[in-house]
Amino acid sequence: MNRTFDRKAYRQELIDAGFSAEDAETIASRTVMRAPRETFQSVGSMVQQATAKIERDSVQLAPPALPAPSAAVERSRRLEQEAAGLAKSMTIDTRGTMTTKKRKTAGEDLAKQVSEAKQAALLKHTKQQIKEMQLSLFDIAPWPDTMRAMPNDTARSALFTTRNKKIPREALQNKVIFHVNKDVKITYTGVELRADDDELVWQQVLEYAKRTPIGEPITFTFYELCQDLGWSINGRYYTKAEECLSRLQATAMGFTSDRVGHLESVSLLHRFRVLDRGKKTSRCQVLIDEEIVVLFAGDHYTKFIWEKYRKLSPTARRMFDYFSSHREPYPLKLETFRLMCGSDSTRVKKWREQVGEACEELRGSGLVEHAWVNDDLVHCKR
């Protein structure tokens, strides 16, 4: 149900939530501009309305009711049942049994198709609404400038690995990426991404893009990027930053989950290029993939203090990715964590020691109260 939008009250709620007065004023003002004059409709309510509409439309996808069977059909079915009963007593398989199974399978397939159609329509409708209202990532998943954010579904996956720097990156073709949650399936095509650099660059680019309407490009310099990452300001790190941006652009990720449905081909960066290369006015231009934003929707993302997070080692950072994506962190098996890190470590004792060191590092960073290994489980207290 629509309600009158109180800008001052909304601004105060944002300030109470930890945003600066300036950011709160910006969000509240933009919300007033994008909402109708007398009412405000949230993204969540749009999705609910879209779902209701699709529920109504999906009725048309259901098969029409079958007419009542004729006397001839009834007689045929009765004979089939009698034959099936006789065959059962003689331990003989029947076509009738197979036909029943086929009917059941066909019904399940149809239900699956209807469900997929509803999810696809909902996704399309939601993306259209976001574009029409010129919403930004910040409108959907706000976080303070001192923090960074990432979707929970990427935080719990092996999309960014902790493999040794000396080992060349793999070129992957439609590879299934390990995910802690069984209902989530990710396939990836592109050069292997590492937590050491690619993960940090992607998170910083999302920070640059968060206040720009989705679908519009953003620009920044290599100097700004390296400075915000805490990297040295020189040609070597400028080259490293450009290589990361190129890898993030040359990706195709298929994503399927019960919550989101199916995303066919998502790139972590939709487009990247260098403007005025070689000149003092040179800048990077990046466009964020619109479908990435869907992974943030519904408060399914985690945010963290950037100054502490970016200084963690890759293993400690991946550990924090997992634990921070849960309100109440569940213990994680050592082997599950190894798979989530994409680690090549084959010696259990060595991996246990490495994880123990990461726990100490994470505890020392102040991002968590306590982290430790007990038996074959990694524990965390936020």
UniProtKB/Swiss-Prot annotation:
GO terms for molecular function: DNA binding. It is found in: Cell inner membrane. GO terms for biological process: DNA replication; plasmid maintenance. Its main location: membrane. Residues 1-163 are annotated as: Toxic in E.coli strain K12 / DH5-alpha. Forms a dimer in solution, binds DNA as a monomer. Both mononer and dimer of the short form interact with Hda (Dp). Residues 246-265 bind DNA. It comes from the Bacteria. Signal peptide: none annotated. This broad-host-range plasmid is capable of replicating in a number of Gram-negative bacteria. It is a peripheral membrane protein. It holds the Pfam family TrfA. The lineage of its organism: Bacteria, Pseudomonadati, Pseudomonadota, Gammaproteobacteria, Enterobacterales. Keywords: Cell inner membrane, Cell membrane, DNA replication, DNA-binding, Membrane, Plasmid, Plasmid copy control. Transmembrane segments: none annotated. Residues 286-297 are annotated as: Hydrophobic region (HR). This is Plasmid replication initiator protein TrfA. Changing residue 254 to D: 16-fold increased plasmid copy number. Uncontrolled replication, in the active monomer form, increased DNA-binding, loss of intermolecular coupling. GO terms for cellular component: plasma membrane. Required for initiation of plasmid DNA replication, along with host-derived DnaA and other host proteins. Both forms of the protein are capable of initiating plasmid replication in a number of Gram-negative bacteria. Binds to 8 17-base pair repeat sequences (iterons) in the RK2 minimal replication origin (oriV), opening the origin of replication. oriV opening does not absolutely require the presence of nucleotides; formation of open complex is somewhat enhanced by ATP or ATP gamma S, while DnaA or HU is required for full opening. InterPro entries: TrfA. It comes from Escherichia coli.
